[in-house]
């Protein structure tokens, strides 16, 4: 498996959990979007967040001897992109502890932007490397390629740019937890 080679560890689809799944934005094949629908694709398609889906399966992870919940694997295989591309916003300088991750993920995006710009939070060393003027990094996706990261990286699906009526964004998404020396992937 290519993922195993890339990661350097065995990768197993965990049959007891949902298999990696699809994010599909845009119209069905042969259908076009109107201006309002195109406008929606040009807006943030998801919240600013860290991936904590593994928390829904805490009882599942208990069956393994060695489990590392601090280093969650997240991956996206790009299948189809809008005409003008697509990608992922990344706030790689936001190094949150577990309590901050738990709080941050359940806030409204407006509150998250305030958190990301909260000078007091960063000045008290709760997060390293903060620059309040810095925009998030943009990781551009390419059709047929996979992007992955390990850890609680703050990120968001980047909205489409100059959306066209037949644009679609289709990706295969998944997550993984290292259990007994193998990545167990799920959705």
Residue spans of the language-model regions?
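Short, solvent-exposed loop/turn segments at secondary-structure junctions
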Residues: 27, 80-82, 95-96, 153-155, ...
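A short hydrophobic beta-strand segment most commonly corresponding to one strand
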Residues: 73-76, 165-182
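Alpha-helical transmembrane segments of integral membrane proteins
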Residues: 130, 147-150, 180
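Hydrophobic alpha-helical segments and helix pairs
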Residues: 1-25
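Residues that flank catalytic or metal-binding motifs in active/ligand-binding sites
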Residues: 18, 71, 84, 168-170
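Catalytic core of non-heme Fe(II) oxygenases with the double-stranded beta-helix
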Residues: 31-138, 184
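Conserved metal-binding segment of the jelly-roll/cupin
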Residues: 139-155
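Short beta-strand His + acidic residue motifs that chelate non-heme Fe in jelly-roll/DSBH
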Residues: 137, 154-163
């Amino acid at each position: 498996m290519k993922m195993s080679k890339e990661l350097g560890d065995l990768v197993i689809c965990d049959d007891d959990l949902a298999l990696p799944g699809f994010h599909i934005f845009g119209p069905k094949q042969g259908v076009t979007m109107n201006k309002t629908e195109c406008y929606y694709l040009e807006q943030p398609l998801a919240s600013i967040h860290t991936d904590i889906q593994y928390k829904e399966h805490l009882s599942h992870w208990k069956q393994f001897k060695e489990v590392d919940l601090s280093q969650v694997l997240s991956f996206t295989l790009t299948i189809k992109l809008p005409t003008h591309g697509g990608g992922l916003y990344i706030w790689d300088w936001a190094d949150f502890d577990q309590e901050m991750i738990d709080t941050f993920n359940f806030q409204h995006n407006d509150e998250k932007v305030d958190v990301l710009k909260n000078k007091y939070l960063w000045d008290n060393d709760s997060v390293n490397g903060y620059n309040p003027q810095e925009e998030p990094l943009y990781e551009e996706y390419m059709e047929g390629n996979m992007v992955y990261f390990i850890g609680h990286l703050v990120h968001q699906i980047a909205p489409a740019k100059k959306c066209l009526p037949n644009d679609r964004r289709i990706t295969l998404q998944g997550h993984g937890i290292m259990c007994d020396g193998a990545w167990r992937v799920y959705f």
